[in-house]
Structure formats: structure tokens, C-alpha cells
């Protein structure tokens, strides 16, 4: 049986998303042996738990303020890497929105599968738009492209691992210049996909999961608080 490792980063109030995420994840390619690797500042009670045939592992990480947690997303995945046939990532505020079957899906299992951003699925951007803060960033893209959502990706382990390593190097290169692109991991993911078009199958598979009003407000408040904190460190 092929092994799929799903990386799931959830700190602060994003930890609430796990209750929704775990409802359907067993329907996500049921032909695979699935392990969910949770990177969190909590959720320790889920370490070594098995539910609906899915194994959960928890690795404790510091609650870094926004945008650090997203900026180093690929680095975290690289650092907590587990050998597998396929690797996947879900944001803490997302979940699988339907059943997926290996023999009946529009996935390319030899490439990195990404998702169009929900607000830009039919729009082409270039390097001068909001996707990158300036051409000082390694993530700057100077050609038309469709903007990819950073909250999800899936692919064979060798390609996902290559992407995480490459993006980590991009982040390090920018930080040496005190540069952070506007959309952090998303900007670097888009740049990697532009540079590696032959390794990418871009389809729109997932959407943001709508939580209850209380949860949505709590998540938004956390993001805004982290934005204010971050401004003290990054001008």
C-alpha cells in the first residue's frame, strides 16, 4: 500500500480547525496508508492517535508570530520530513471538501498538484502586482502567471521534498537582504511553480472551509494581533 504523509500546521486559534479537518480526511484517497503530521503549539492529545484508519502524530513547534509561521512553512515540513510515497499539505483552516479516489481524480500523481487561489482562478498576474512586494525578492515573477493558493499542495515525495528544499533556500537568500515578499510562502511557492512548470499540475481542488462565526472571528483576531506584533520586528 502506498503511504501518504499529510502535513498540517495549526498554531494559536487555528488549532480549532482540526475538529473539522479530521471529519473527512479518511475519504482523501482511501487507497493510501495515511499519516497526518501535525505541527502545532498544542494538540498533544492527538499524538499517536488512530481514527478512521488515519494515524496522527504531533510535533511541538513554537507559536511564532505571523508571518514567521508561514514564511518558514516549507522549512518546517523539510525539518519534520517522513519518508513516504506521496506528501501533502493542508492549512490549519482548510479541509478535504469531497471524496477523492486514486482511480477517479484529476490529479497527476507524477507531479506537484496545487490549487488556484479562490480569488484569482481566472486572472493572470505579473511580477508588478500584489503577489510580490518588490523585485528585490527572489520570489519576484516577471511574467504572466495564475496565482496559486499556498494553503494546499500534493505530490510525489521527491518533488515535494525538492520544492521544500528550494523554497527554504529562497527564504534564506531573501532574509540575508532583509526582504520578505508580501505573501511569504505563497509567493515562493508561485515562483517555484513558474520555474518548474514541467513538474506542476495546477488544478483547483480545494476551498477554504467555513467554520462557525465564533471560530472565524477568533482566527481573524489572532491574525490581526500577529500582524501588529510583527510590525515591531519587520518594517
Model-predicted regions and their roles:
Residues 44-54, 102-108, 211-213:
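Short loop/helix-cap segments at secondary-structure boundaries that form the rim of catalytic
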Residues 11-13, 42-45, 63-64, 94-96, ...:
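Short, solvent-exposed loop/turn segments at secondary-structure junctions
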Residues 138-228:
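Catalytic core and acceptor-binding pocket of nucleotide-sugar-dependent glycosyltransferases
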Residues 73-124:
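GT-A fold catalytic core of metal-dependent nucleotide-sugar glycosyltransferases
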Amino acid at each position: 500500500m502506498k503511504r501518504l504523509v499529510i502535513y498540517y500546521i495549526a498554531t494559536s486559534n487555528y488549532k480549532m480547525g482540526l475538529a473539522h479537518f479530521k471529519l473527512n480526511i479518511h475519504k482523501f484517497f482511501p487507497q493510501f496508508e495515511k499519516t497526518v503530521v501535525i505541527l502545532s503549539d498544542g494538540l498533544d492529545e492527538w499524538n499517536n492517535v488512530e481514527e478512521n484508519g488515519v494515524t496522527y502524530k504531533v510535533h511541538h513547534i513554537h507559536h511564532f508570530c505571523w508571518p514567521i509561521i508561514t514564511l518558514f512553512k516549507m522549512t518546517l515540513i523539510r525539518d519534520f520530513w517522513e519518508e513516504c510515497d506521496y506528501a501533502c499539505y493542508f492549512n490549519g483552516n482548510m479541509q478535504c471538501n469531497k471524496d477523492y479516489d486514486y482511480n477517479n481524480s484529476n490529479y497527476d500523481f507524477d507531479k506537484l498538484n496545487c490549487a488556484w487561489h479562490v480569488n484569482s482562478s481566472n486572472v493572470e498576474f505579473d511580477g508588478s502586482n500584489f503577489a510580490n512586494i518588490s523585485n528585490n525578492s527572489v520570489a519576484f515573477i516577471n511574467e504572466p502567471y495564475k496565482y496559486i493558493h499556498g494553503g494546499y499542495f500534493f505530490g510525489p515525495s521527491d518533488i515535494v521534498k525538492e520544492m521544500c528544499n528550494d523554497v527554504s533556500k529562497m527564504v534564506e537568500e531573501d532574509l540575508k537582504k532583509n526582504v520578505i515578499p508580501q505573501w511569504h510562502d505563497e509567493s515562493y511557492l508561485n515562483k517555484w511553480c513558474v520555474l518548474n512548470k514541467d513538474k506542476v499540475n495546477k488544478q483547483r481542488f480545494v476551498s477554504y472551509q467555513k467554520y462557525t462565526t465564533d471560530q472565524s472571528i477568533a482566527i481573524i483576531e489572532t491574525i490581526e494581533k500577529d500582524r501588529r506584533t510583527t510590525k515591531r520586528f519587520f518594517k
